Amino acid sequence: MDLIRNTIEGLLYDFPIELMGNYITKDDSIDINEILIDIIKRKDVSFTQTDISLLSEVINDTWCTDAEFGISPETSSLTNRILLLMTEFSKHVLNLAGLHNPTVRFNELLRWRTLSLKVGEDILVLPLLARYDTLCRIKRKRFLWPMVLEHDNLRLNAILDEELSDTHSHINAATDVFEFNWLRLMNMPGRKKDKGTFWISSAKKDYDLISRASNNHYPLPCWAVIAATVRAMLWASVTENEDACPITRVMVEEMLESEDSIYNKLESLNPLIATFLENALETSNGIKIDYAIDARDFISDVPSSPYLVHHGERNFLYQWFKSFFDNEHGARENADLMLLYLIIKCKVRREFVQTNNLRGFVNFQDYDHEKVSTLDTEEEKWEKAFREITYRYAVQTSCGDKKRFNLEARVTPNNIRSVRKMNYRQAIFGDSDFLQRNDNPSITLIAHFIKGVDKQKNEFTCRHADLRKTLKKQMNQIINRIGEYSMGNGPHLIGLDAAGSELGCPPEVFAPFFRYAKLHGLTNFTYHVGE
């Protein structure tokens, strides 16, 4: 089991994108199997040379065959079969039963978590679901489970279903930053911010020796556009809209050969996505976040679950893999394009989700800085609506629909008013309520002040003069609105927090401001140390 887990990680997480692109453009000198084995040898020294020498044969003849569907080395190349690695792994780890949501076998939970942390859960779940449903001759329409699957330990689940409190939740970190940004990249390709994000320099890949050794001749924005193109092309195929789709495999190959061609193809891609979005389900505040969330699938009722946000990507993967097992819509012939799509997705994901091996607060901050939108929509109304969706998602997925869980969310002082004004009771899609009417999630707020190193070396000013001025301004804003923040239907402000490393910013900087707040009725204070 560990060997197949390492193989999948090597394929999706470590495999150089440009080599996969070169393979698709008919570079016969590239051996996917050979490269994959070389990656595993370099990453995991726990396997012997004998283990590794047998791996190539096992991949080709055992893991990447499926007799039930006539998929074997005699019928297709390894590249068109290698996605079977996911079903081979997941069938030993997941429980499937009819149309119920999948669960993880408790005794396999560590192996599942170790791999899904690197590549995400949906990539491992949807292929197995598609295979299972094809064999059972059923087709599911809704994919509304949490981003982290539940396990099958009923006694432990019963304990976890009791009332719980999260007293240190960073609300930005609870928004599934990567998932939301990926939806925007796939539905608004080519539109990006020019600074402050991984688009300028994918720095986190430099921590990884395999990534550093690979010649990534395109920056990540280009690969994201290619992924959006592949997704639109495959979506048109599985939904039988190929006649209206101007994107062809030849066009994708041209994009892989020339960077200029990538953005030229946006002239065909953006109108196609706009056509797909005509049938997309709108959120309650009137935006369409994913063309694969088809409104025609929810004519009778729109689920109030916040996980409907993920339905589109899951629906796309499910329909494509179902076509793969049914041998329809040219899915098997385009399996290498799906593999390219998944590799690009994992490369972008590793820029948002902390999966590298570094430790310490600086590494944490590198990822924390990515908890923002990567795209510039140029539309303030759209941006505001999207922000409300992400915050509503964070609160609803944390608190649950039965108010069993209590959330103490940390927000910056400047965001308190906007966070309090948001309607967390209303469902993200449709007109229904996520909670019962006149009910609100159990959420309270902590004002989150950020420590800073003293940058002004001047004998005529006190230490941290600029930070003290900022703290004074922010604290006065809070004190002047303390009555507003402590009443009404929105989340109440109940305390203050000084976050970040105390190195270079001792408690003396915050002490007078905390005393000032205490005089005005705030008595709940926390101060981060040891980071």
Language-model features, listed with the residues they occupy:
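Metal-cofactor-binding active-site regions of metalloenzymes
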Residues: 1-531
